[in-house]
Amino acid sequence: MTMAAMITSKNVSDLISNSDIGVLMHGPTFMANPLACSVANASIDLLRDTSWQENVKNIETIFTQELEFAKELNLVKSVRNIGAIGVIELKDDCYAQEIQDYCVKNAVWIRPFGKLIYSIVAYTIKEEDLRKIVKTMIDAIKSIKIENEKK
């Protein structure tokens, strides 16, 4: 039983697959892995037996409140969130490594994507953990020397 399917444009497929066969070769990598199957079943149980939609709504509210503090920072172009995804978009992408290093040093795993500093959290996250993640993202931006200088 396949656990997932993937659809992509030819341009994206060409970028991530160097196969001469002409197809994306990563589709079946974890297909029917016993551990993945067990996790999938547990996930289905969680979806059936919990108030996950309410949890996601609460996460979105917290992201909205906490990301507001990033809007005033010089390096920040915009902030946005939807559901359990929170994003800070920077004006430039040259600070990604500094931001990641700061976050990891402060026990938060963030992997910037170009100018985007983002977090996609589990809908079972504790409120204090979510607030710590967002605060650390913002503190990481504040820690960059240029952030403390005037425009």
Task: Identify what each model region corresponds to.
Residues 1-151:
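Conserved N-terminal phosphate-binding loop of PLP-dependent enzymes in the Aspartate aminotransferase
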